[in-house]
Amino acid sequence: MKFFYSFFLILIFFGVVLVFLFRAGWYPLALVNGNLIWGFSYEQEVNVALKYYDQLTKDKVLDETQKEDIDVEIRRSALEKIIQDVVLADRAEADLGVTVQSEIDSRLAKYMTDKKLEGVANNYFNMTLEDFKKMILEPQALKEIYAEKFKADRKDFDIWFKGQLKAASVTLFTSEYKFNRGILELNS
């Protein structure tokens, strides 16, 4: 009988721990080319996008249906952005070499000393400068590096990138979305 109570208490303990981990975002949301996307990074991306959108539309009056539609689209776009960033970063080392991070850092160095950038990150995105760099600036700099490389080779970056997204191995651990030929769509 003592074994049963001990087992039951251990089971309850692990259940409570799992609930706290899940609420903190420690659950896998997607697997992209072998890289896990965690719930906390998705929620952070969504919160940043919602904060930015609120700043842009603070004077507009929207009804509840419009707000819900916008919220759904922001959530979809946030996950799609994370998937795109992972696919691009995954290809970067193979395509551009191991110096890609140093090139990104050198591009961003001149902006990182600007005090106004910290204010923009804080006021418009509700982020620290370091988080802003990691989530917004670095992926954008990588896209620019690729675009310049493709332009120099007289190729179209957008067509290549769409092909990379179509070829990416994306497994979603949510029934809310489906990844269809490189595009994240809402499940009907």
Where does each model-flagged region fall?
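Hydrophobic membrane-insertion alpha-helices, especially the h-region
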Residues: K2-R23
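Charged interaction scaffolds used for protein-protein
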Residues: M1-K2, F157
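Generic alpha-helical secondary structure signal
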Residues: L9, V46, L56-T57, K115, ...
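Weak global preference for isoleucine
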Residues: I10-I12, I37, I70, I74, ...
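N-terminal targeting/tethering segments
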Residues: L21-E130
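A C-terminal, polar beta->alpha supersecondary segment
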Residues: Y27, K134-S188
